[in-house]
């Protein structure tokens, strides 16, 4: 499997009692119909660590049903140890997802050997197309490129690496050392065009939840060599990304970023997203007004 293009890390709609599967189905249907290459519901943006295992499986069942072979369905583990990762991965495999994205162990800052051992334990037990992942603002550490290289050399089911580090020099190392064998996928919307220009194969991004086909247009422009147009579109979006941030990397609101993506999706698409799941905070009226202005400036509302 060679993953190229845009995989959408979707938000998870909630009611006061649980996941709003009707709204989820509507959102996924719109994203797939817009032509995106894949969907990734159990993501950081989708509040995966706040979903029960049963909710995660049900979310992926809905995604698989909606995609219907028209888009890749990627499932994220969202777990911090190898036993839980193996358990949820096997359940995802039973659902029939197309690929697995493995969340690295978090809470403790692990060394190279521990990270490598974690991947070995999981991949020895789970044989399905797999995307490795680094997200240091959630784990407290960045995974050395050499660890990804070792794991990819040993396990043929590894097909890609998602990079949400925000460290562009590190990202260039991934492209240089792994890009010929694996799909290097940018995890931050604000770095998507620069990544494509330097040779990344695509992105796993949350912006398309509310941007419509804009992210696909960025991808198309780069692939067609229309670099000036791609850069102009990138720069047009920068005020939005500076406000919203991504993984807490930039943005005025820091840890509220998953809520912002959810609110933006409801404003633009008119789908009931409900509240974030605690302890994620809601945004206040001032933040909402600023978000609405930015969306209006882009012609989205």
UniProtKB/Swiss-Prot annotation:
Instruction: Name the residues annotated as catalytic in the UniProt entry.
Output: 44, 107, 133, 162
**Its EC number(s):** 4.-.-.-
Q: Assign the protein's first listed, main location to one coarse class.
A: cytoplasm
Subcellular location(s): the record lists: Cytoplasm
Give yes or no: UniProt keyword Transcription regulation.
Answer: no
**Pfam family name, one:** DHDPS
Q: Which SMART domains match?
A: DHDPS (SM01130)
**What InterPro entries does UniProt report for this protein, alphabetically?**
Aldolase_TIM, DapA-like
Q: Which GO terms describe its molecular function?
A: 2-dehydro-3-deoxy-phosphogluconate aldolase activity; 4-hydroxy-tetrahydrodipicolinate synthase activity
Enzyme class, broadest EC rank: lyase
Q: Which GO terms describe its cellular component?
A: cytoplasm
Keyword list (alphabetical) reads:
Cytoplasm, Lyase, Schiff base
Question: PANTHER family recorded for this chain?
Answer: 4-HYDROXY-2-OXOGLUTARATE ALDOLASE, MITOCHONDRIAL (PTHR12128:SF66), DIHYDRODIPICOLINATE SYNTHASE (PTHR12128)
The entry's family comment says: Belongs to the DapA family.
Q: How does it assemble?
A: Homotetramer.
Q: What name does UniProt use for this protein? A: Uncharacterized DapA-like lyase Pisl_0309
